[in-house]
């Protein structure tokens, strides 16, 4: 319901923007007399982009223009544009002609606010040379990225570009490299978000890949290094744009994109909501908002949520929703590597990162894709001071030749590395299974977890009872009795609790209250690491 209200309000704002742009176009003077009039004419030309015909064409595709997108993303009246008068510098192939000069070139850049918080933004304008990147276009983007780094504010890129501007040759390629360099320099310093709202091909794809989060719009956005025609000529594969690089491909198969939205308005509204979870920079604490959900709220339904039979599945997402503030959970990559859950929520108003195994998918086993998905998310949270809460129900790593040949050892080590390296507050709740090496990996006490809880249903052991009995009691006459003995000794939380590997065995209903209390205590946590140039994560 709330999302529908936001979309309705956004569409109303959009109508106002379109009317104001059209009014500006009607007032356009073609015979400048003074410098002031010339300035105003240039300004109006910049607002018009590639012209009304191209704007109409953009709308017919179900897409907004670059300026309409900025207007919906930012708070009303907060956008301050920079470099509106910049034009490309190419003189070859007829580009020097006045008809090929557009104030602002093919990107709109500047700063504004989202819910009162500073953000820098660039929005590529497909109505001008298909949004292609020129040297001037890249210069504008680099300038706002430099400014964002200087003041400590996030950068959001609204991508809608045909790629490099061929007429400019190597200058266009140099422009991409300039942007990539800044993406890398800003990584872990300020949040970087890419929203793909049209084509993004060739060299253009690497900037979104270097940012922290990449979102897409269904049916109108595409990400690929080489398009369908090149694929056909090289590999003889017949593939459509949507199949090769559409939103479904990248949110369910490749893992390149983190979420996909129905249309431009839906994407921009969700991006505003997502932005609220993030700090402005690595020097700022995670945002805290007023909370009306009691921090000591008990959740009685959690006492019976885990089935008595250890082989029966349940939905870890239900547990997450019931514990976080007001059941508000922004899941990241919900359709990729579904055996692990990651996303943002709030606990007593404080932003937290959630990681959880999903027993409904592959019994919650860790595999290559889920390990990489989890590791990337954990490292983002650690870089930006966001506490981590981990819900564990993991029977181990997924066995099989496909996983071994694919490098599960190396990829699984990424998740282990991420949790071990993280110095933010780390709270872990073992809901049921925590077997073998996967137990260690999932933010265990041994990886410097700050607070580690177990529910009464927790089973912390090297492996499940059946497999263990087959090894320990091989040839034993009474296998059932042996299995019962193993369960009594190991398939429960007590062995770990006795050794201090879990801090407490808690009633599930008290989980929210315990976590909120722990977060208050851990808010002042500080960890000093030995100096090093950079770590060498097993990429």
Curated annotation (Swiss-Prot):
One of its GO terms (molecular function) is propionyl-CoA carboxylase activity. Optimum pH is 8.0-8.2 for the propionyl-CoA carboxylase activity as measured with the holoenzyme. InterPro entries: AccD/PCCB, AcCoA_carboxyl_beta, ClpP/crotonase-like_dom_sf, COA_CT_C, COA_CT_N. Keywords: Acetylation, ATP-binding, Ligase, Mitochondrion, Nucleotide-binding, Phosphoprotein, Transit peptide. Residues 32-290 form the CoA carboxyltransferase N-terminal domain. Residues 32-533 are annotated as: Carboxyltransferase. One of its GO terms (biological process) is short-chain fatty acid catabolic process. Pathway: Metabolic intermediate metabolism; propanoyl-CoA degradation; succinyl-CoA from propanoyl-CoA: step 1/3. Residues 325-358 are annotated as: Acyl-CoA binding. It is found in: Mitochondrion matrix. Pfam families: Carboxyl_trans. One of its GO terms (cellular component) is mitochondrial matrix. The keyword Ribonucleoprotein does not apply. Its EC number is 6.4.1.3. The modification N6-acetyllysine is found at residues 99, 474, 489. It catalyses: propanoyl-CoA + hydrogencarbonate + ATP = (S)-methylmalonyl-CoA + ADP + phosphate + H(+); butanoyl-CoA + hydrogencarbonate + ATP = (2S)-ethylmalonyl-CoA + ADP + phosphate + H(+). Belongs to the AccD/PCCB family. This is one of the 2 subunits of the biotin-dependent propionyl-CoA carboxylase (PCC), a mitochondrial enzyme involved in the catabolism of odd chain fatty acids, branched-chain amino acids isoleucine, threonine, methionine, and valine and other metabolites. Propionyl-CoA carboxylase catalyzes the carboxylation of propionyl-CoA/propanoyl-CoA to D-methylmalonyl-CoA/(S)-methylmalonyl-CoA. The holoenzyme is a dodecamer composed of 6 PCCA/alpha subunits and 6 PCCB/beta subunits. The beta subunit contains the carboxyl transferase (CT) domain. This is Propionyl-CoA carboxylase beta chain, mitochondrial. It comes from Sus scrofa (Pig).
